């Protein structure tokens, strides 16, 4: 029964694959929980810096920092693109890249030059053939990236802004809504659109050393760095949740395939047995 042997081989192969995808699903679920914890832990940091900057800027409105000045006409833009290093996470990266490309095409149609920085192997491989100026590449950050890992890359882009090479800097990443929903997002970093601060109708009467302007400049850079890091940890949360869902779907599909093949195998085996019985009966009748 050659057909039956082939089917049994297929069933065995699919079951082995099912074990692998099931294990990957459990690993992704564990990593997703840790990534979500890091994401939630980093949010208060951004909010606190935003609050301090809001009070400081309100108290010293005479400061006109370049990072807080709005543009009259946009001629160049820089985008920090955050993706995963690994695949097997559904359409997470593809959806983000399509969203970014639509924006890039729109910018270029309006005569706006686009420079990019890629974080993650998938973004690096995808965008290297689109003729965009890649100012920096950062990969292999792992599942638990440190804040300091991003500083060099962010500095390159901010230096481009300071030198006038780019007039606007944004970060593109997948925003984590919940386990099932991840939203491709492009968030403007500089010029800073708005700084949210509670109770902004008063300001703190502090003495700043060396002076308030230098403190504000340092905090603005730190705030931008914190926003990029927040985007990175959110993207990692999206990656792990997407991978968990993709592996669960693969595991379920493997189970369905095994059931179908087992049904086909049983039918083929039943047909073979029926044929053998018929041949035996026919042979007996002929002998009589």
UniProtKB/Swiss-Prot annotation:
Biological processes annotated in GO:
proton motive force-driven plasma membrane ATP synthesis
**How does the UniProt record describe the way this protein sits in the membrane?**
Peripheral membrane protein
Q: Name one GO molecular function term.
A: proton-transporting ATP synthase activity, rotational mechanism
SUPFAM superfamilies named among the record's database cross-references: ATP synthase (F1-ATPase), gamma subunit
Q: Name one GO cellular component term.
A: proton-transporting ATP synthase complex
Localisation: Cell inner membrane
The protein's UniProt keywords, in alphabetical order, are: ATP synthesis, Cell inner membrane, Cell membrane, CF(1), Hydrogen ion transport, Ion transport, Membrane, Transport
Q: Name one Pfam family in it.
A: ATP-synt
Q: Which domain of life is it from?
A: Bacteria
**PANTHER family reported for this sequence:** ATP SYNTHASE GAMMA CHAIN (PTHR11693), ATP SYNTHASE SUBUNIT GAMMA, MITOCHONDRIAL (PTHR11693:SF22)
What's its job?
Produces ATP from ADP in the presence of a proton gradient across the membrane. The gamma chain is believed to be important in regulating ATPase activity and the flow of protons through the CF(0) complex.
Which family does the record assign?
Answer: Belongs to the ATPase gamma chain family.
Q: Which NCBIfam families match?
A: ATPsyn_F1gamma, PRK05621.1-1
Q: How does it assemble?
A: F-type ATPases have 2 components, CF(1) - the catalytic core - and CF(0) - the membrane proton channel. CF(1) has five subunits: alpha(3), beta(3), gamma(1), delta(1), epsilon(1). CF(0) has three main subunits: a, b and c.
Protein name per Swiss-Prot or TrEMBL: ATP synthase gamma chain
Organism encoding this protein? Vesicomyosocius okutanii subsp. Calyptogena okutanii (strain HA)
Cite the source lineage: Bacteria, Pseudomonadati, Pseudomonadota, Gammaproteobacteria, Candidatus Pseudothioglobaceae
């Amino acid at each position: 029964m050659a057909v039956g042997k082939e089917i049994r081989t297929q069933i065995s192969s699919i079951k082995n694959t099912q074990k692998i995808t099931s294990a990957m699903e459990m690993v992704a679920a564990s990593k997703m929980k840790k990534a979500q914890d890091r994401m939630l832990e980093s949010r208060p940091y951004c909010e606190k810096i935003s609050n301090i900057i809001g009070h400081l800027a309100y108290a010293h409105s005479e400061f006109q920092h370049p990072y807080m000045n709005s543009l009259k006409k946009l001629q160049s833009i820089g985008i920090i693109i955050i993706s995963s290093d690994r695949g097997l996470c559904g359409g997470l990266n593809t959806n983000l890249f399509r969203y970014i490309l639509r924006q890039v095409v729109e910018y270029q149609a309006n005569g706006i030059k686009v420079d990019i920085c890629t974080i993650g192997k998938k973004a690096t491989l995808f965008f290297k053939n689109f003729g965009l100026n890649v100012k920096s590449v950062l990969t292999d950050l792992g599942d638990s990236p440190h804040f300091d890992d991003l500083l060099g890359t962010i500095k390159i882009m901010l230096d481009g802004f300071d030198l006038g090479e780019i007039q606007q800097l944004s970060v593109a990443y997948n925003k984590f809504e919940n386990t099932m929903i991840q939203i491709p997002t492009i968030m403007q970093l500089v010029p800073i659109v708005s700084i949210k601060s509670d109770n902004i109708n008063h300001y703190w009467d502090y003495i700043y050393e060396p002076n308030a302007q230098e403190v504000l400049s340092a905090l603005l850079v730190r705030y931008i760095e914190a926003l990029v890091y927040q985007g990175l940890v959110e993207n990692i949360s999206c990656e792990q949740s997407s991978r968990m869902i993709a592996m669960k779907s693969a595991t379920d599909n493997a189970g369905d395939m095994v059931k179908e093949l087992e049904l086909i195998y049983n039918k083929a085996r039943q047909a073979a047995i029926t044929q053998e019985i018929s041949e035996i009966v026919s042979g007996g009748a002929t002998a009589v």
